[in-house]
Amino acid sequence: MTILENIRGPRDLKALSEAELGELSDEIRDFLVHAVARTGGHLGPNLGVVELTVALHRVFESPDDRILWDTGHQSYVHKLLTGRQDFSKLRSKGGLSGYPSREESAHDVIENSHASTVLGWADGLAKARQVQGERSHVVAVIGDGALTGGMAWEALNNIAAARDRPLIIVVNDNERSYAPTIGGLANHLATLRTTDGYERALAWGKDVLQRTPVVGHTVYEALHGAKKGFKDAFAPQGLFEDLGLKYLGPIDGHDIGAVESALRRAKRFHGPVLVHCLTEKGRGYEPALRDEEDHFHTVGVMDPLTCEPLGPAGGPSWTSVFGEEIVRIGEERADVVAITAAMLHPVGLAPFAERFPDRVWDVGIAEQHAAVSAAGLATGGLHPVVAVYATFLNRAFDQLLMDVALHRCGVTFVLDRAGVTGVDGASHNGMWDMSVLQVVPGLRIAAPRDADQLRTQLREAVAVDDAPTLLRFPKESVGPAVPAVDRIGGLDVLHTADRSEVLLVAVGVMAPVCLGAAELLEARGIGCTVVDPRWVKPVDPALAPLAARHRLVAVVEDNSRAAGVGSAVALALGDAEVDVPVRRFGIPEQFLAHAKRAEVLADIGLTPVDVAGRIAASLALAEPAGDRAGGPAVEQPGDGRMSGDGRIVMPAQGEN
């Protein structure tokens, strides 16, 4: 057995020799490369924290000592060392999550995986332990760009205010955020400043000098200032120490002994300490190190030797379609600019940045600032396009509401990874945007159903200069084009029937689901009209008279069914005094487990069979048994779905 295979928990690390620790690190990297290549996942960040994670678990007693991970995608090594070595179904249904998970292990504390939050968590946990008289340690690991987030600095400000509250902050500086500091004097002074003896001597000297009449305070301030200036010339800790944090480093994050030594010194303090570790993203895997874009931050299923993607080739992604079209628009309009929050490549803005380097800004992990800056750009006569993941726009709701919408700024928000994202798990599903944003006055929301509509609606959005607009689209490849057969007002009609009883409102990428459901229903003699509203907020006025000609309206959306498009449609029909029942199909009010997107949609009942079955059951409840022409009466179980042989079975969770 390998050394790694013999590790059942953190305590097994403590008896290993220096040579064995080096061998273990090599085994972990080899394991990660091959395991993540089979499933896809975050490879580069985890290759960079191998020694750091080993040192953390050798110095601290997890789970009694709480080790908290910011941006939890760098927790794979932590999982391996805490008894979770079955990576065969990583990020797959029934397998390990790609992020920390409380359901998996007592060693996992934070699982939301949104960056820059760990220091706030650590501040609260440290306060709780101090109030309760506990002596265990709280260790917050932050890095991979997370210190660009404003929340991290808000937390640092509060952490530093309590000089007597122990808390250890480990900065994983993987050369993507900080410039490394060099020089033995800097290391020596950092070590000196973090010894108990030095702190006692400093406190004694300060007390003596400040009690000396007339000159004492002046002498102390002069000496203290000279010391700070001398040290800051060699090391970057001035900012942290000015906040009141003890600074230790920089430390070679790939030297287990050096990291352990720094962490043990940090444990001896009675206040907040920051340990600065220099690491290399993608360490030990040459293809990752050669990847200038992001050092293999995330990879799909691939050959670990050639790095060639494996599996069936998909079509163009939604992201790439957006990226190509925004460049075309930029060629035509010099006023169109772009903003993203540390996601230039993932959201498709890299081609725009290459073509127009002076018209794009990456603001770091700062969605709030992105929205407010966009308001300023719009007020200055430009049209900003803010491209972020849908789940991260939640952070900028107040700014979108009060800075963009209130001021009627012409800003276009483009939400990538909207709806069910699947394998990235609960915190990365973009399933709340169309619910949360329903309350924003003046905001227009578009949900394109295919690539052509994405291109068209993006152009429609940037043409609006007196209100905010928003487009949303999912992860993965774009499906085939879904042509319209007619247009009623602003509605695209995708399907009609001679005797239509059901109006299916297909929100964006749910169009194929609705068309499939219509086909199943019509096989049972239930005629359907399928429309795509294109712009789902505000509700198109043409929908009310169309709905009035049907027995039932069903709204199908890849969004929370609570307060989503279905609710908005029901409200609009009520205001228009159209007395037709509205059934809402969407994502239930729960956090979704990681699985493939298709698996999640099936689990929550967003498939053609599920939608058709529950619509048939609803119609059966609305009339006496045997009244329907064209077939036998449908059973009336209260609610249900259509099985393959036409029977009604109990529903899944995605409808009410």
Swiss-Prot record:
Record text on cofactor binding: Binds 1 Mg(2+) ion per subunit. Binds 1 thiamine pyrophosphate per subunit.
Residue ranges, annotated region (Disordered): 625-656
Transmembrane regions: none
Pathway(s) it belongs to: Metabolic intermediate biosynthesis; 1-deoxy-D-xylulose 5-phosphate biosynthesis; 1-deoxy-D-xylulose 5-phosphate from D-glyceraldehyde 3-phosphate and pyruvate: step 1/1
GO biological process: 1-deoxy-D-xylulose 5-phosphate biosynthetic process; isopentenyl diphosphate biosynthetic process, methylerythritol 4-phosphate pathway; terpenoid biosynthetic process; thiamine biosynthetic process
Annotated catalysed reactions: D-glyceraldehyde 3-phosphate + pyruvate + H(+) = 1-deoxy-D-xylulose 5-phosphate + CO2
Gene Ontology CC terms, in alphabetical order: cytosol
EC numbers for this chain: 2.2.1.7
Listed PROSITE patterns: TRANSKETOLASE_1, TRANSKETOLASE_2
A matching Pfam family: Transketolase_C
EC class (word): transferase
Co-factor requirement: Mg(2+); thiamine diphosphate
MF-aspect GO terms: 1-deoxy-D-xylulose-5-phosphate synthase activity; magnesium ion binding; thiamine pyrophosphate binding
Binding site for Mg(2+): D144, N174
Function: Catalyzes the acyloin condensation reaction between C atoms 2 and 3 of pyruvate and glyceraldehyde 3-phosphate to yield 1-deoxy-D-xylulose-5-phosphate (DXP).
Family stated for the protein in its record: Belongs to the transketolase family. DXPS subfamily.
Database matches in NCBIfam families: dxs, PRK05444.2-2
Subunit structure: Homodimer.
Protein's UniProt name: 1-deoxy-D-xylulose-5-phosphate synthase 1
Organism annotation: Streptomyces coelicolor (strain ATCC BAA-471 / A3(2) / M145)
